[in-house]
Structures are given as C-alpha cells and as structure tokens.
Amino acid sequence: MSRLSAAVVAIDGPAGTGKSSVSRRLARELGARFLDTGAMYRIVTLAVLRAGADPSDIAAVETIASTVQMSLGYDPDGDSCYLAGEDVSVEIRGDAVTRAVSAVSSVPAVRTRLVELQRTMAEGPGSIVVEGRDIGTVVFPDAPVKIFLTASAETRARRRNAQNVAAGLADDYDGVLADVRRRDHLDSTRAVSPLQAAGDAVIVDTSDMTEAEVVAHLLELVTRRSEAVR
C-alpha cells in the first residue's frame, strides 16, 4: 500500500547524481510506481540509430519519433524497456545511444511527443515517482513534490567511471569527465526544456552523501510534503 498521498513525485537532475537508483529506491519505499523518462529518449535514439539516420538530422529524427512504438514497466525493481515489442533494456544503455541521446532529445517534436506520452503513462492507480530532466518544469509543473538532485561534475564523473570499471569497461576518468561536461552543456543550453531546477523544487546536493543517505533524506521530504497536501 502506498505511503504517499501526493500523486506525482518529480525528480530531476543531470546524469551521475544517483538520480535513477535513488528514484527507484524511493518508489520502492513509498510503494509507488516508477517511470524512467530518460529511458524513453534512449528508446527513440536507438530507433534512430537502427534506422541508419543521423541523430542531428532533425527531419529524420522527427519522422522516426512520430511512429516509434515503445513500452516501459513501472516496477522500481525492474528495467523493462521495449522497442516495437523487443526488450532493449540493455542496448539503450550502450555507448552509441549515450553519445547520441542529447542530440535526439533536443528535437522539439521528440520532446512534445514524449511529454504527452509521459503524462498518459503517469495516469493510473496510486502514486508515481517520475525521474528525468524536465519533470518538475515541463512534464508535471504542478506536481506537489519536486526534487532536483545535483553534484559536482567531478563527483559525477568519478561515479560514472567507477560504474564503467565495475562493468568491465576501461578506466577513463578524464574521458568520462569530458563527456559529463559536454552533456551538461547540451542539456542546459538546448532551446526546448533546458535542464534546470523548478522554482519550487527542493535542491539536494548528493556530492558528499551515500545513496542510502539521499534516499532517507528524500523519503523525509516526500512524506512531510505529502502530509502537508492532505
């Protein structure tokens, strides 16, 4: 049974803040559903790459995005992402998609379609934790609970590099740091839905916090806010 009365918990922030893992754990603690909107942009990006299109070709990206068929699970303990019925949960996390997703997600038509889909997917019984980059500012600007996670670029690069090494990839902190800074620039300067905290969001710097500490802090924030809106 859900411990949350507020319908939507919006969690935004750049990559490497622990956003995805924290959001999943928070949803589990709250007994809420979970929606990873970043995975949706990755699915569209994978569709673009599979079609052999250039991610910077706006017309081609728009055409592909308008017809792409996707579905995602709501279980915070799972990672079910499907493209045209095929499980692509692992493939969308690959380097090729990671390098191209910023270009694809900056296309206005892509964001328009996915925002509509995100709002539809969030409907249903119970509460939902939605994580992304424009949830509190664009997708659910009226969400009763808005949280923006942040951390220094260096901290986020260390975390991402450690994940790569643990997964058997090369130890390349400098390369990861450069990619983090590049992604930050692209996300914060794009014309449509730039990455920024909502004016009424609670900003949490996770640089010196463990994942468990962040989850405990957010659980307290969400519970307190939920009680306030009852």
From Swiss-Prot:
GO terms, biological process: nucleobase-containing small molecule interconversion; pyrimidine nucleotide metabolic process
GO (cellular component) term, any one: cytosol
Domain of life: Bacteria
Subcellular location: Cytoplasm
GO molecular function: (d)CMP kinase activity; ATP binding; CMP kinase activity; dCMP kinase activity
Reaction(s) this enzyme catalyzes, per UniProt: CMP + ATP = CDP + ADP; dCMP + ATP = dCDP + ADP
Pfam families on file: Cytidylate_kin
SUPFAM superfamilies: P-loop containing nucleoside triphosphate hydrolases
Gene3D superfamilies for this protein: P-loop containing nucleotide triphosphate hydrolases
Entry keyword set: ATP-binding, Cytoplasm, Kinase, Nucleotide-binding, Transferase
EC number: 2.7.4.25
CDD domains: CMPK (cd02020)
Binding annotation for ATP: G13, P14, A15, G16, T17, G18, K19, S20, S21
KW ATP-binding (keyword) present: yes
NCBIfam families, per the entry: cmk
HAMAP family reported for this sequence: Cytidyl_kinase_type1 (MF_00238)
Family stated for the protein in its record: Belongs to the cytidylate kinase family. Type 1 subfamily.
Subunit architecture: Monomer.
Protein name per its UniProtKB record: Cytidylate kinase
Source organism of the structure: Mycobacterium tuberculosis (strain ATCC 25618 / H37Rv)
Gene: cmk
